[in-house]
């Protein structure tokens, strides 16, 4: 009888742990980094944002094509009928700054969580720039986003 109670208790514990793990697991969201854009010099709002249209994109970014033989120097095309753009823009600086997205996850409540790190390194440059990252995510993940700066 004692062995049966031990087995039942162990099974209940295993099932509870498995259900808890399944209920709290976030789904990773794939994304693509947009290339060859720059932050417009009239942008004053540096808060992270989700961009839903070409018009909205053009309020914050310009296109910066570069020469290449294979066409890789063109700005990434964004189809706003299928994708949203996520922009993380930092304040103007003269120190090398990297914005790295550590994860984008869809939570069980339907919201997305975007975690990112900002690191600065090196000596000051004689010029300044506005560090940013611009990534594309599928619209199926929605546009209710929480940004977490790590």
Which positions does each model-derived feature cover?
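Bacterial N-terminal signal peptides that target proteins for export
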Residues: 1-9
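Exposed, flexible binding/inhibitory loops of compact, secreted disulfide-stabilized domains
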Residues: 22-150
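Bacterial N-terminal signal peptides
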Residues: 10-18
């Amino acid at each position: 009888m004692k062995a049966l109670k031990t087995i039942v208790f162990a099974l209940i514990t295993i099932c509870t742990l498995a259900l808890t793990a399944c209920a709290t697991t976030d789904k990773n969201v794939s994304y693509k980094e947009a290339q060859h854009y720059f932050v417009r010099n009239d942008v004053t709002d540096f808060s992270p944002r989700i961009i839903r249209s070409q018009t909205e994109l053009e309020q914050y970014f310009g296109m910066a094509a570069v020469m290449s033989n294979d066409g890789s120097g063109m700005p990434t095309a964004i189809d706003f009928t299928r994708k949203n753009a996520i922009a993380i823009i930092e304040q103007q600086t003269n120190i090398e700054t990297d914005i790295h997205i550590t994860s984008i996850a869809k939570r069980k409540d339907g919201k997305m969580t975007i975690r990112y790190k900002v690191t600065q390194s090196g000596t000051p440059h004689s010029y300044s720039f506005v560090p940013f990252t611009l990534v594309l995510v599928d619209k199926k993940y929605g546009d209710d986003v929480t940004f977490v700066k790590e």
